[in-house]
């Protein structure tokens, strides 16, 4: 009886053999290397601003930038993203600190605040319009003189 059971098990395993009928293939790619403005600094000049006219809408300047990627090969599951970083003002999460206390530079993408530390998904063929707008802390008394500020705009495929 034991011999017959063993024979049946072995016979069953031989009948289960089949030819390969699945093939897997693809192409391994690296994410494209993308840059903003060919890695050149973007300089936004405001010129002379009247202290009492800084209201968060006046003096808006477009941030001129372009995104260039070194490869046209894409993975549809990957997203092109922009990340904004810098020293955040103490009165507006979308404003970069400036060298003048109480003055910040707010960045907006498509007229919406672009909060520092945040990441947005963008379309390489239709990048968002970025604007820089001087903003003043409520109740602040700004001092006359020059100002400057810096931030970092980074592009990635994720």
Features from the language model and the residues they span:
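Mature extracellular/passenger domains of Gram-negative fimbrial/pilin and adhesin proteins
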Residues: 17-158
